[in-house]
Amino acid sequence: MIESKIPSQFSINSHNNVCEASSYSDHSFDDNTQSIPLSQVVIRSDFANETSERQSKIIIERFNQGIKNPAFTDSPALGRAFPRLDSSYFALSNRDKVAELFDPRGQRFSTVYSADPTTIIEYNGGIPKTSRYFTLYGKTVLNVPSGHFAKALSKNRPVIYGEGPHVIIDPTFIFDEATGFVNQQEPFINHSTINVLRVPSGKVAKVWVGTQPLILESRREPYVFVDAQFKVVEQIGSQDKYFHNSSATFMEHGSIKRIIPHTGEVAVTYNNGVLEIIQTPKDGKPVIIDSPTHNFECFIQTSLQTCLFPSNETKQQAIKDNKNATSDEVNLKIFQTRDSLRVGVVLVIAFRIIDPQIALTKLGKEGIINHIENISFADMGKAIQLSTLQEIMYFNDTKPSATIDASAQTIQDRVKSHLARDLYEYGIELARLQIETIKVLDTEIAKKLAGQSVTSAEFTTKQATLVKEYDIKTTEARLKAETDNIALEQKGIAIIAEAQAKLESAKKQAEALLVTANAQKKVQEIQGELYSKFPILAEIELAKIKSEALKSSTLYITPQDAGNFMNSPFFFMERMLGKQQTNIKS
C-alpha cells in the first residue's frame, strides 16, 4: 500500500517551541548569592489549560514535527488493520528509528506499507493518553501531575518541568519516573545545581552559597539558587532539620550574626575590638551583622534589677577563705559600730544601667555587680562605724527618707546618696538601697535587744489597738450621722413629691372646669344662632319651660272663669305643638 498522509483533521498549526528541554545554566548571573524567581528555572507547559482534545492534537503535532511521510493510516488494507484501541490511547510506532504518534480515536488503523526493503516500520503498541511519561528514540511526552515538579536531565544539565503536558525532542533527555516527580510543597528541592527552598512562617534557614553564608527569612515565595556549591545547614536530631526558630534572640552563621534585643536589654558587640551597643530595633526587625570581625558578646539588662548582698559568689569565696566560718560570717557582711559592737547586715539594692557604653567600658560585663557590691558595703561600713548600735537599730525601723535634709537623713539615706553619686559616674542609676537584715553578733546584747523588742512590740500592739478602737467608734458615729441625713433627705423628698402631686391634681381639675365652661359656652352660642335663625324654636323652648313650671302646680278654675280658660293659649298648647311639628316634617 502506498503511504498516505495523516488526515487534515489531525493537523494543527506548527509550534516553534518544540524542543522544550533547556537548562538554566545557559544563563549567566553576576551574583550567584542572590535568589532568583522560580519561573526562571521551571519550564511551564504552554498548553496545560487547553481541553483534552486540544492537548492531544498539540502533543501529536509536536511529537511528529518534521515527519513528511506518516507511518500510520486510517484506511488499512484488508488484513493489515491492528486491533482497535480505546479512544483514550495513542498509537506509537517508528519508521527507521524515528518515533511517530497517532490518535486512532477508536477507529481501524494500521501502519502504511513500504515497498522499500530498507525502510523498516514498526508498531510499538498503544500508549494511554494519561500516561505520565513515555519515550521512544529521543522523543518524550511528560505529563507532570498537578502540584508537582518533574526533575530531569537534558544535555547532562538539570531541568525542572512544571505541571501539565510537555513534548521534549531531545535524544539526551533523561528522566526517572520513580524518583523524578516531586511535590511542590517540599521544603527543600535539590536537583543537581538547582535548589528550591521554602522557608515557612516563624522559621529561618542557614545556607551556604560557595563560601558565602546566608540567613534566609520566611517569605511566601521560595528561594531559588542555581549553584553547585549551595548547601543547607541541617539540624541534627531535630524534626525541622532545615530550619531554625526565627524568635531566637541570637543566631550566628559564618560571619552573619542575627540579633533580636528585647525591651529592657541591649546587645553588646565588638566591631574590630571597639565596643558597640545595639538597642532594641524600633522597626520590629532583627539586627543583621555581616562582618567576620564584628562579634556578639552578650545581652545586658537595662531594666530595673534587684540584688541581694552578700551575693552567692561572695558567700562561696568566704567559705573558700575560711572553712570554719560560721553561718553568720558567711551569710552576713560584718561591720563594727562606733561603740565597738559587731553587727551583720544584708543589703537589698535596686538599680538600672542607664548608659551601657560607660558601664561596660569602665567596669566590663562581669565587674558591674562586683563593683556595686563592693562600694555599697564600703559606704555602709563607713556609715555604721560613725553610728552607735542604738542609732543603727532605730534607723533600721525607718524607711529611707525622701528628703535631702542632712539632719533628718537616716543611715540608709546617707549611704544611698553617696552610692548614687558613685554609680552615676559609671552609667548606673541607683533606685533603692535597703538594709534587709541586721543582726547583733554579741549574744548578751542581742538578748537584751530582743527583750526591748518584745516590750516595744507590746506597746505598739496596745497603741495600735487603741487607735483601731478610736477608728471604729469614729466610723460608727460617721455612719449614724450619714444615715440620719439620708433619712431626712428621703422625708423631704417625699413631702416635695406629695406637694407636687397635689399641685398637678389641682391643675388638672382647673383645666377640666375650664374645658366644661368652654363647652357650655359653645353650646349656648350654637343654640342662640339656631333661635335667631328659627324663632319658632325659641317659642317652643319657652313653652317647654312654662310647661315644666306648670307640672308641679295645681290650677283651680271657677265657673265664672271657665269661658276665659277655654280662650287661654294654654288650652290650645298641645294642639299648637302638634301642628308645628307637622309643618316642620313637611
UniProtKB/Swiss-Prot annotation:
Pfam family membership, one: Band_7
One biological process term in Gene Ontology: phagocytosis, recognition
Domain of life: Eukaryota
Cited InterPro entries: Band_7, Band_7/SPFH_dom_sf
Record flagged with keyword Calcium: no
Coiled coil: 472-526
UniProt KW Acyltransferase keyword: no
Keywords: Coiled coil
GO CC terms, sorted: early phagosome; membrane
UniProt xrefs under CDD domains: SPFH_like
Family: Belongs to the vacuolin family.
Name of the protein in its database record: Vacuolin-C
Organism: Dictyostelium discoideum
Chain's gene name: vacC
